[in-house]
């Protein structure tokens, strides 16, 4: 293999690793956001039996976004969720909703 071809192959491999690392970092970031919800809503949004707190696993994405935005704006009354929702950007809320919608109930 010629020297230029080797550099090209190495560059392409490095670019692929970088993209995979970025995807992994994104997944870990969203999982770290979701971990904050586990205190009340259970690991990965699965509540324990007889919990008064709703499970988030499998919740429709658009519904969760709507509810979180309502908490954030104060339109939906809550004991604590309105304060927690204000700590997330709109993009983070959308990421969380996508994450929980993908979880099995």
Please give the residue ranges for each predicted region.
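Bacterial N-terminal signal peptides
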Residues: 9-16
């Amino acid at each position: 293999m010629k020297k230029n071809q080797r550099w090209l192959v190495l560059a392409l491999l490095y670019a692929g690793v970088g993209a995979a690392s970025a995807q992994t970092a994104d997944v870990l970031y969203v999982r770290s956001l979701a971990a904050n919800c586990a205190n009340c809503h259970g690991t990965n949004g699965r509540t324990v039996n007889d919990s008064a707190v709703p499970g988030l696993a499998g919740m429709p994405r658009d519904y969760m976004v709507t509810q979180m935005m309502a908490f954030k704006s104060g339109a939906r009354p809550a004991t604590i969720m309105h304060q927690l929702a204000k700590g997330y950007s709109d993009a983070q809320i959308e990421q969380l909703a996508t994450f929980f919608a993908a979880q099995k109930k």
